[in-house]
Amino acid sequence: MTADIAATPAETPATNGHGDAHSTASFTALTLGSIGVVYGDIGTSPLYALREAVMAASSGGEAAPHAVMGVVSLILWALIVVVTLKYVVILLRADNHGEGGTLALMALAQRGVARGASIIVLLGIISGALFYGDAVITPALSVLSAIEGIKLVTAAFDPYVVPLTIIILVMLFAVQVRGTAKVAAFFGPIMLIWFLVIGIAAFPPILRHPEVLWAINPLHAVSFMLHHGIIGFITLGAVFLAVTGAEALYADLGHFGKRPIQTAWLFVVLPSLALNYLGQGALVIADAKAIENPFFLMFPDWALIPMVALATVATVIASQAVITGAYSLTRQAIQLGLLPRFEIRHTSEAHSGQIYIPRINKLLLVSVVLLVLLFKSSSALASAYGISVTGTMVVTAMMGFVVIWKVWRWSPIAAGALIAPFLFLDLTFLSANLLKVLEGGWVPLALGGFVMTLMYTWRRGSRLLFDKSRKLEFPLADLVAMLEKRPPQRVAGTAVFLTSDPLSAPTALMHSLKHYKVLHEKNVILTIETAPTPRIDPSERVRLEQISPTFSKVTLRFGFMESPNVPKALAIARKLGWQFDIMSTSFFLSRRALKPAAHSGMPRWQDHLFITMSRSANDATDYFQIPSGRVVEVGTQVTI
């Protein structure tokens, strides 16, 4: 999953779950932009994918020509079936008001089911958690594989590969705070050059050994699998490296649109990748020793250093897309109630999606550097790659079935017939990758399991806290009726009480009445909702309900791709007749100090984890962009 990198939100959002036309930006610019952002990950897979697959097929020995043909055929048909058919043809139609990605798909699937929504949420949590594993491994593997090319110039560079990789990664994460808007405009042209170069470089070896073109025949892939038994199954796990990054096609749907992404894949990316894999295959057929690094050995000696430089830039771009994807996913998870509030900084005035999350950036940097130090080579790290991506693809296929059945209104048999072949293939790839758990596959599983535990704990704890608070709090309607009959002393101005439950009297309001024994002239019960759509039209942002001469309810709605700005949203309420002046308004927020209860509904360890997460949450004042000088916080203690 990737996010806003030089991507102008170019589409008029579709509303029918069949994402289509983008009209507000140049089609050519969008297509070029998608090449730079969407295809960075899958575009740098030739650096290691065929090498690892052939080494798996030959069990570390010299690969026979028929085995190389089988591997190349498997890679080509994986690109055709998994990427072209599943993602480019089918899933790009399953948009959530123009947006893609697993959490957007989860929200779309939730709207289609009355029962079983909790299962959909669980699938979304699994998919989102696995992505963080991918976000850690991709930068480490990509940059490491590019820098390793320098060893072909001279073995003397070998000791410097890991230190140089770490330096580049540290620099990459260090510049995140400044945003990528200025350099992102170059991502598309650079990646276009990359695809042209890797495609053209394949012609000489293909012309010398044109028999490699027979690998396009799927019978070579079938024959390889039938005659190699468990080795063929293990090889599938390495073949999958060629399609890692396919999720980005769907994740970046909202940034570029269906047509530009499809055009870039069919006319630039797929032909270049296919040619390069065929070229590498021809090289290894001619010289089995070329398996050491077939990608770089396709180039003449004079081009090695320029290609290492270009590959390094390409892998940095691929890593950048994954990093910003992690930011975007985190914001969506916060808005959907799967994670506590984190500090979110906007790095561009022009693009709302250009964000930076300091806490996520630090965690990713530490994790990525540790991986490089732990595995030390791209071959070792490749064993850890694939499990998180295959897991995400399996979940995507499952939720895609629900959308096709419930949202598109297909019959379950027709929906099953469409998705079943892809789900079977995804499960096969997942099974093959699970064989690599002990070799390094445990890394993304451990990372995913940890994030999954955090998401599940936060969602469950928040639900329990909400239910408990509702039982303890006073009904708002009863309180308003009492205050209208026996009004306390009034003070000038407007008081806004932020609450997650508009039916109950906010804790801050009750404490204000108890301690100050006064009531403002105007009192607003403010609730902030997250809609199951990426964005909300400004005309639908505010709902205003007058419940008494003194009290009114205001509901602000934000999409899960938006960062809530309360003062800006409240300004819209003026059009509804509410006179809002930030300088005469005080915002009352309650800050809860949580303590574990004897019987909370969660295990003791989960209680403590939820409390720790709650304490680490970013301040509501900052998150909702409320001026701190207008905020009054009231502390309360709650057992959970």
UniProtKB/Swiss-Prot annotation:
Keyword hit for Chloroplast: no
Disulphide-bridged cysteine pairs: none
Region (Disordered): 1-20
Subcellular location(s) per record: Cell inner membrane
Membrane topology summary: Multi-pass membrane protein
One Gene Ontology MF term: potassium ion transmembrane transporter activity
Domain of life where this protein originates: Bacteria
Cellular component, GO annotation: plasma membrane
Transmembrane regions listed in the UniProt entry: 30-50, 71-91, 117-137, 155-175, 183-203, 224-244, 265-285, 294-314, 363-383, 385-405, 410-430, 437-457
Family to which this protein belongs: Belongs to the HAK/KUP transporter (TC 2.A.72) family.
Free-text function comment from the UniProt entry: Transport of potassium into the cell. Likely operates as a K(+):H(+) symporter.
PANTHER family hit by this protein: LOW AFFINITY POTASSIUM TRANSPORT SYSTEM PROTEIN KUP, OSMOTIC STRESS POTASSIUM TRANSPORTER
The protein's name in its UniProt record: Probable potassium transport system protein Kup 2
